Design a protein with these regions (language model features):
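Formylglycine-dependent sulfatase
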Residues: 1-257
């Protein structure tokens, strides 16, 4: 792996050492400032052979749900150019820094989700002085459960066919910004958090940073559990290999989490 996400995902999808990967840092195609129209990370090359391509060649249906991070649609690193039959989620690692993105990619089409909050940072020197409210940094549709729902639809569809499938589920959690649904925050004691996180180390402020971070992990755990339950309900649990791993290192130091 690598200490940051896009190079790690290049390693994961190709099996190469970081020194031999196309993506070795967080270099971008654009400046990364227009959150409503991010152009994507530096893409892998067309000739780079990926795990989905290998699985497709072996006769598997292939799908990716969540975070891709090695090429936007229209680039040489687009999922559909590297053996992915079904894609729903984020192609851009910077767009993944918010759980309320303006859109997600549904195969090669943009599915509009949110019209308000888009950026995952308030900018240096913009820390709120008064009360920090989680709702200030929320919008209409949270991406995590939407992605998980699409993933489960794929599993149920393929469960009735004869073709085996390869599924790469890449949830965003627990990457900051801290934006879990409130129901997951409320599961944890208020005394965990002595003070709010005001965004002074980057990303968005949050009134309960420790509970929020734990809530993101719980939300991810819940959706992984939904996947395992669906495999069992479809009679696939005894004939499916499940690998759980992470993409890179420790959390951003936001609010003492």
């Amino acid at each position: 792996g690598a200490p940051v996400c896009s190079p790690s995902r290049n390693v994961l999808m190709t099996g190469k050492h970081t020194g031999n990967c196309d993506v070795q840092d967080l270099k971008r195609v654009d400046a990364g400032e227009n959150w409503r129209d991010l152009k994507g990370d530096w893409p892998i090359r067309t000739e780079t052979y990926t795990l989905p391509e290998a699985m497709k060649k072996a006769g598997y249906a292939t799908a990716v749900f969540g975070k891709w991070g090695i090429g936007d649609f229209g680039s040489t690193g687009a999922p559909d150019k590297h053996g992915v039959d079904r894609f729903y989620g984020y192609t851009d690692q910077k767009a993944c820094h918010t759980y309320y993105p303006p859109y997600l990619w549904n195969d090669g089409k943009k599915e509009v989700l949110n019209t308000s909050l888009t950026a995952a940072t308030i900018g240096h020197g913009s820390q709120p002085k008064g009360e920090v409210l989680a709702d200030t940094y929320r919008a209409e549709q949270h991406s995590s459960d939407l992605i998980a729902d699409k993933m489960l639809e794929f599993v149920k569809e393929k469960a009735h066919g004869k073709q085996p499938f390869f599924l790469y589920y890449a949830p965003l959690e627990p990457h900051v910004a801290m934006q879990p649904l409130q129901e997951w925050i409320d599961r944890y004691p208020r005394e965990w958090d002595k003070s709010p996180y005001r965004g002074n180390r980057g990303y968005l402020p949050h009134p309960r940073p420790r509970a929020a971070y734990a809530g993101m992990i719980s939300q991810m755990d819940h959706n992984v559990g939904r996947l395992l339950d669906t495999l069992k309900a479809c009679g696939l649990d005894k004939n499916t290999i499940v690998i759980f791993t992470s993409d890179n290192g420790t959390t951003h130091d936001a609010g003492g989490v």
